[in-house]
Amino acid sequence: MELILGSQSSARANLLKEHGIKFEQKALYFDEESLKTTDPREFVYLACKGKLEKAKELLANNCAIVVADSVVSVGNRMQRKAKNKREALEFLKRQNGNEIEVLTCSALISPVLEWLDLSVFRARLKAFDCSEIEKYLESGLWQGSAGCVRLEDFHKPYIKSSSKNLSVGLGLNVEGLLGALKLGVKLSLL
């Protein structure tokens, strides 16, 4: 069965590659600006459901489609993708020395199965080095990442402690997805 990743995220693509999952990457357009909620959990769930509905339009007999959405929450205040450097700096100031939550809603749809999961990755951060913040902002790497969070590089040395489900923090619940894919294969054999 062909697997399609309905996302332009390189982090999600890398997670699938690291787990030996073969896939084709296709962008799905869903207007997240149409969502009016400020609750991080509700937002990420509704965004993922919206992408799942778009994925249903692409669904064919022999394919499965994976979609996901992530937001960052600091003190229950939602951080999406920063629109500019000023907003990116505000996000980083709020995260500095605090606990952050990366909320990721992952979903899979196939002819035999529909799976949806909302998981949270938590990390307690040390204080950021001011000169490193400036370099990070200048690099532009923060663009396109929810809350400007990049656990794979910028944020990595500042993690004091965290939950164990790093793939959720990187934008896709791979462990849950692998279970859903195995279940889908078993169901298709019935």
Curated annotation (Swiss-Prot):
Signal peptide: none annotated. Its cofactor is a divalent metal cation. Pfam families: Maf (PF02545). Belongs to the Maf family. It catalyses: a ribonucleoside 5'-triphosphate + H2O = a ribonucleoside 5'-phosphate + diphosphate + H(+); a 2'-deoxyribonucleoside 5'-triphosphate + H2O = a 2'-deoxyribonucleoside 5'-phosphate + diphosphate + H(+). It is found in: Cytoplasm. Its EC number is 3.6.1.9. Keywords: Cytoplasm, Hydrolase, Nucleotide metabolism. It comes from Helicobacter pylori (strain J99 / ATCC 700824). GO terms for molecular function: nucleoside triphosphate diphosphatase activity. It is an enzyme of class 3 (hydrolase). GO terms for cellular component: cytoplasm. One of its GO terms (biological process) is nucleotide metabolic process. NCBIfam families: maf (TIGR00172), PRK04056.1 (NF003141). The active site is at D69 (proton acceptor). Nucleoside triphosphate pyrophosphatase. May have a dual role in cell division arrest and in preventing the incorporation of modified nucleotides into cellular nucleic acids. This is Nucleoside triphosphate pyrophosphatase.
